[in-house]
Amino acid sequence: MNQNERKTVARRMILLIAVACVIMGLYVMRLIFLQLVNGDDFKAKATNTTDYNFTVTAARGDIVDSAGRRIATTTTSYNVVLNKLLMGDRDLDTMLQQIVELLRANGESWNDTLLIGQADAAGNYAFTDDDTSTSDQKQLADMKETLGLQQYATANDVMEMLVEKNDLQDFSPEWQRVLAGIHYEMDRQAFSNVNNFVMAENVSTLAVATIKEHSLQLPGVEIVETSARSYDQSDIIPAVLGRVGKITAEKWKVTDSNGQVTYPLREKGYNMNDVLGISGLESVYEDELRGKDGVKTITRNSDGVIVDTKLTTVPEPGHTVQLTIDSNFQRAVDKVLADNIDMINRVYNTGTMKAAAGAVVVLDVKDGSVLAASNYPSYDQNLYAANYSEYSSDPSLPLFNRALQGLYTPGSTFKPAVAVAALDSGLINQYSTVYCNGVYNYFKDYHPRCTRHGHSGNIDVVTAIKWSCNIFFYDVGRRLTSDVYDAYAYKLGLGQRTGVEVSEAVGRLTTKSDSNYMASLDVQAAIGQGNTVVSPIQLATYAATLANNGTRYRTHFVKAILDTNTGEVLSETKPEVMDVIEGTGNTFELVRQGMKQVPSTISGKISSYPVPIACKTGTPQRSETYAPGKHYLNAMMVAYLPADDPQIAIGISIEYGGYGARTGDLVVDIANAYFALKDGSLAQQAEAEKEAEQTQQEDQAQTTDPAQAAAGQTTGNAAAQPAQMTPAADTAAPETAAEGEAQPAVQDEQQPAADTEQNPDAIAPEN
């Protein structure tokens, strides 16, 4: 390159550098201008963000048995949730149609509580509410009020308003109804930038996968993990545990007598779509089980861009509620109750009304805690929703909590209460006698009877309890009057609340204020007939009070409240004395002596059981007759054992069970299960049965031969039978005319009826 060429290149380089410097200078000047002149404006814009807080539902606390085994727990489920912040400008109704189609394809439904069905062929709509449902009627009224419609508005009026309000005119009638229902739900849940909309709940994993596959087409549609209630041991006291459910319209919006509207659950932090306890222990301990919800915060800038998502408050799970019940013992009592009813039907009720239902309650004598509360028949908690129609239409009433709400005439189980009253009041002592010749002749036109089974002549209180002498208690009851023996019966736990945490029937005793009262009614009520009705849990409480020499503890199901994370005991149920009969002299010892001798009068296992049992049978009449003057009978029993150092008390009722003595083997089976619980063998047996069941299920899963599967099931069940709990049904001794229980007195025209309108022996709960 010559010199001229070099000079040309140099000049060009200088020019290029100069241009670059000018451009750089212009950029620097612009940056200085932006930073110094408009810096505050840009800073404000950069920091102009908005936080949106969303609730993260806390897991519900577990319910466990006395050994810590889970009964009710929380499992993961999946909800389809719409987040308005993330939806952008996508057409909402088009997106809703797509979600509905995806849900339908996977057999799923979506939330729709609009009480209007699809249009008929003429294009008309009709309400689908239940005329008898208060909740439905309130929801309809609230819906019409919210839409600005009169209460006489028709379903067509409501749909017309919803279609117009939500711009659904261009959709087919079918889609108008679907989308109107979803929009209605959105309004109910207050769908907004700060409130997500739960469109579908508890969807399958297949539906989850399908929706996630279409996530790019569905902005703002999220799959949210949430908690669902499930029951690991769904057969354990389902009627006592109760249920959880969605918040109803009448609980969410409360209108008082002055027309003032309040939202008490919202004030407590609930959202309308939340689940809460609606019955039983799930409801009573809602505050403990519920937990504290967390908060998720989404931050969006002024351009609508999500710049941050974080969990600002971690949800805290609810506390654990620990029961006094051991699930293995409860299951054992359930089984022996069913076995006893089966035995009664096979051995005794072969040609008469079958025993179809019953209840047993077992208490810890020392503190009133419930060890078992069995109902037969019962139901599976996990199948409640799916089988509700079947359960509710079953004439044997499996949903009915007989143990706590069944009311039964106690029959002769009431006699120890009369004995306590007579002894403690000084009316009689251990040497006092009443002459029994089989007929009570005090009244001119009323002569109730006694079978004199095992006794006659002069009878003292111990012998009267042993042989259930009606004449003795007729006379003592007449002399005491119902005013006196009722006062003692109340203190012993009959005809009043036991104190359990959940709903129970109160029952009643026969009183002088009864509309059918006459002096002879005191005589009938003294043997547990008349108008008196009590529940099985009252019978068990009564037996425990007799065992405790007159001290009655509050009956309870809950042992403690525990911290879910640490297991720390937050609160514990202490023994609470509800009432005391001081018991002058040897009142309770004499009653105990009589009750200890009752087993010797009963055929079957109880008469030779090595552990002394104090018990009293009852054979109350039912209103139904199987022949003129012949009433069907219930079988009743109260017991405690060991008689000289009581640990457990038992109350039993078997509908149409016949004589109370037929429950003697049931008492023994319960005792065997209790002692097996104490020595650990019951837990070992339960574990062995569980393993055998699992093995059987695995074997059945591997076999393709139905005959082999059936044979395997039979073998497995037979192997799992606990030997000590199999009633000696087929070898039971022939039933005697009285079998340890005096037959009901023969009625004549002047005798007050044992069953009246005020004294139903039906099992309906008291309101």
Each model region followed by its residue ranges:
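Solvent-exposed, polar/charged alpha-helical surfaces in well-ordered, non-transmembrane soluble domains
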Residues: 90-101, 209, 213, 238-242, ...
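Intrinsically disordered, low-complexity mixed-charge segments
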Residues: 677-718
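Structural motif corresponding to the C-terminal cap of alpha-helices
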Residues: 336-348, 426, 599
